[in-house]
Regions:
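Short, amphipathic alpha-helical "recognition" segments used to contact nucleic acids or chromatin
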Residues: 1-19
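Short, solvent-exposed alpha-helical "recognition" segments
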Residues: 2, 36-54
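Exposed alpha-helical structural elements
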Residues: 10, 34, 45-46, 60, ...
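Residue-level recognition of short, well-ordered coil/turn positions
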Residues: 19, 43, 73-74
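The alpha-helix within a helix-turn-helix
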Residues: 23-26
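Amphipathic alpha-helical protein-protein interaction segments
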Residues: 55-91
Length: 91
């Protein structure tokens, strides 16, 4: 599946908004099954843009969570602890 640069940029933006693959396919006018296959390959350009989009928003959310944890939010502190443990387990 060949996507244009514009479609890849849109894919990343929509993934950053946590749109589903079905929604993204409809919005960038590609076949849903083909897009899903490309994303599952993990090494395709589509997968790179899809996962980068998701991760960029996750990073923003984690920054906000960290700020709340630093201000004493128990829920944010717990979330940061879980993220830290997950990171350590992945090393």
């Amino acid at each position: 599946m060949e996507l244009t640069n514009e479609q890849l940029t849109q894919l990343e933006e929509l993934a950053s908004l946590f749109c589903s693959i079905d929604e993204i396919a409809l919005l960038i006018d590609v076949d849903e099954a083909s897009l899903r296959r490309e994303i599952r390959k993990k090494t395709s350009e589509a997968a790179k843009y899809y996962f980068r989009g998701k991760l960029l928003t996750q990073v923003k959310l984690r920054k906000q969570t960290k700020l709340f944890a630093e201000k004493g939010s128990p829920q944010a502190e717990q979330t940061m602890k879980q993220l830290y443990e997950r990171q350590c387990n992945n090393e």
